[in-house]
Amino acid sequence: MIDVCYLVPGVGLPSDEKERRERVANELTPDHVDVTVVEAEGPGPTSIESAVEELWCTVGSMKTAHRIQSEFDALVIGCFGDPGIRALRELLSIPVVG
């Protein structure tokens, strides 16, 4: 089994949306891949729509990703702008994609 973390860099994701994203991701991946949606720890923005919000969410994303990386084989940043992707690639020992 390949375990993939889908990291949501914002905070305050409703549980039903988390479940929806997880369900859709797992429907779209092969059977040997398991995707788990993880929300970054705060403080941080609810949505990321500006350069300020991109930077604001990066520290929480890095803290969360560093703490959980041993549980996963890869990490996907669940945000269109891929906030913090370069820093996360430096920090983690697992592949990071946007």
Predicted regions and their residues:
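N-terminal glycine-rich anion-binding loop in soluble enzyme alpha/beta folds
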Residues: 1-59
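Short, well-ordered coil/turn segments that N-cap beta-strands
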Residues: 31-33, 72-73, 94
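Periplasmic-binding protein-like
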Residues: 73-79
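Short, acidic/small-residue loops that bind anionic groups at enzyme active sites
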Residues: 89-98
